[in-house]
Amino acid sequence: MDENEIKKLPPFTAALTHHAIKKQYPFDTPGHHGGEFYNLTEEGKIFTQFWGNSMFEGDVSDSDAELGDPSSHEGLAGMAEKLAAETFNADKTWFVLHGTSVSNRICCNALLSSGDLVLFDRNNHKSMYQGALLQSDVTPVYLETIRFRGGIIGGLSSKGLQRKTLREKAEQIAPAKMKKKHPYRLACLQLATYDGFIADARYFIDLLSPLCDYILFDAAWAGYESFIPLLESFSPLTQPLKKSHAGILVTQSVHKQLAGFSQTSQIHKKDHHIKNKKQYLPDDVLDNSFLMHISTSPYFPLFSSLEMNACIHKKQGQKLWEKALRFGIETRKEIMRHCRSVQPLLPGNIDGRPWDSYDTENIMTDRRFWNYRQMSKEMGARNISPHYLIDPCKILLTTHLGEKKIPAALLSMYLQNRHITPEKCGLHSILFLAQPGDTKEKADYLITALRQFETACMDKPVKEIFPSLSRTYDMTVGELCTSIEKLLDTHNAGDLEEKMFILSDKTTGISGKKATDCFVKGERKLVPLKQLKGRIALECAMVYPPGICGVAAGEKWTGTAVSYFAFIEEYINAFPDFAPECVGLHIKEEKGRKKLYAWVLPKKKRLLNRQR
């Protein structure tokens, strides 16, 4: 690499590149010293040769004066974070190298203390539960969420989403908080759901600012909205803020759909409009929380990728995301035209015409084509908020609304066997991410595979299409689809998944923080699934992905939750190759079957808590 090429790079990345290509004589960490340690063995040489010298030469210590300490926010590292803040319209940005799970916990730990009230989106990722409810002794007021048929995660329900209702709930729980202008210290919201619904940030900022000091938008599954004109009001960081508005924090998983290495994340802070107010979160307080959660031995190329992401988006963000938006639309159109059982999740007809009959240019600029309220009847959901759109950069395909019902896990495995990796799948949905680097060749390969699965695989033996399964299914692929669907129907799996998130069915026994303390202290009992109803959970229980808590720590296990996880248990035993992963439940082998158990508060401990 010559000097002219390096000059085109942003400062931190340019310095790291210079460092990596110069001969070094390190006596500091990391101990592999540019790969020299590995190269002492045959296996190590294979390792370094495959990954290339740059990967090892770029792994340097923060003892190096040229590059400095990335956690200090000074020098070249500070310049990189400042570039990101300018690019994404933040007052200040923190680079986080351990994922948005850590970013969320940093923000919650900086803002919340014992006794606070928090408005809490029930769709939040488990890291929000951990940071807000398990680590901080706060009281949540949950916001109702939507589940569509097929297990598809919608946004917030319009039910109960009124200031008066939320203020009344705060008064019921903590009357003393009503003396404050804002009864809630923080609102924790998902800007974009895993299944591709994105919230109108402007609406939620206006709605919740009279109630909350701060709003934390988890934008792990977004980050590009400010570069797409269609989503102009959906970016929390580009909205004009008044002194009456809440302070804004936004966390982004740069590695998901932006241009970052795995684990890269960033926190954006925008609150200069309340800097002289009592509720203001000083940068030093957030930085203190940041330093509690990060490593003092960062991998510098991760930091560099965050700077490069900011650089690329500052120069060409809108152009690049126009390309991704166009790709997402064209790919959906082709799937609609060539597939019969697998179809994109879309509103359907617009003004009496099929969605795919419109010009791509129209679809790119008109929100009617992404309005998911039009799907309410078809998808079996009520109380849909008008303040969400289908995310145009997430291609969510349904597998239960076409000619034949197909379990999405079966389709996912088929595609992965052909080196096509979906982001995730639910019961009847499968997600593909649209990004600026995607090509028509990739889309064509995907569409061909989808079409082949529908037309050429159903009558083939399972062992021919899926030769590496853990057990033998002596049937055709079509018959296997029918068998799995029968299991789903027998357990009313779709209805159970929807009911799992109805708030009226949930009862809190103790706080999440207290549940965690009991779990750590040994005040716990491992109980089989069938005996869980009415017991207080000590761990958050969920299916993963997406990592949304079905039962939160401190809540009582309901009959619905027990029935839902009983279905998952049966799924694991009947079709182990296709069953989802459980988190917060523990598998034991009993008489040749897998049984689910969960940690709960012992009954004697419950009596003691009541007496106190």
Language-model region placement:
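Conserved PLP-enzyme active-site core in the AAT-like
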Residues: 86, 100-113, 117-336
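Conserved N-terminal alpha-helix of the aminotransferase class I/II PLP-enzyme fold
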Residues: 55-102
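Short, composition-biased local secondary-structure segments
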Residues: 44-55, 96-108, 166-178, 380-384, ...
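Non-catalytic terminal extensions of PLP-dependent enzymes
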Residues: 1-58, 65-66, 74, 86, ...
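General small-molecule cofactor/ligand-binding pocket signal
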Residues: 94, 141-143, 423
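Short, well-ordered loop/turn elements at secondary-structure boundaries
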Residues: 89-91, 113-114, 183, 201-202, ...
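Short glycine-rich or small-residue beta-strand-to-loop segments that form or flank ligand, phosphate
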Residues: 94-96, 187-190, 430-435
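Generic alpha-helix structural propensity
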Residues: 71-79, 102-103, 301, 326, ...
